[in-house]
Amino acid sequence: MSIGVPIKVLHEAEGHIITCETITGEVYRGKLIEAEDNMNCQMTQITVTYRDGRTANLENVYIRGSKIRFLILPDMLKNAPMFKKQTGKGLGGTAGRGKAAILRAQARGRGRGGPPGGGRGTGGPPGAPGGSGGRGAWQGGPTGGRGRGGL
């Protein structure tokens, strides 16, 4: 499974100044050294603002991804290549259409939505493509089926 666009953008922010707020309310602002796929962030030259308003300077900090409430990334990342419309082979015209288009494409691949008949031999006369008179190989049709023989 590939990583999503937000995580790709987070990786693009490595080496830039970001702001990170944790679920405890502390705000860390500094240079992002490394970001992992689970959003763990390693930062340097940090200015931390605590919930009560006090500030402190830290040299290095490592923040667990599940403890991050949100991140503020540089505006220059709006032009990152991940936000460009993807075109080309393999996309089949479903780029940016969401989960519904994916499910539709998968259903088409399984033979749904087409003309009736075909499939497991449940329709059509014997000898027709996909047809065996209603009896498939697994039901004792003309092609066998658990030792019962044909018709």
UniProtKB/Swiss-Prot annotation:
InterPro entries with a match to the protein in the record: LSm4/Sm_D1/D3, LSM_dom_sf, Sm, Sm_dom_euk/arc, SmD3
A GO biological process held by the record: pole plasm oskar mRNA localization
Family annotation (SMART domains): Sm
Key word Signal present: no
GO molecular function: RNA binding
Location of the region described as 3 X 2 AA tandem repeats of R-G in the Swiss-Prot/TrEMBL record: 108-113
Domain annotation Sm: ranges: 5-77
Subunit-level organization: Interacts with the SMN complex.
Record's function text: Plays a role in pre-mRNA splicing as a core component of the spliceosomal U1, U2, U4 and U5 small nuclear ribonucleoproteins (snRNPs), the building blocks of the spliceosome.
PANTHER family the record matches: SMALL NUCLEAR RIBONUCLEOPROTEIN SM
Family, per entry: Belongs to the snRNP core protein family.
Record-given protein name: Small nuclear ribonucleoprotein Sm D3
Higher taxonomy: Eukaryota, Metazoa, Ecdysozoa, Arthropoda, Hexapoda
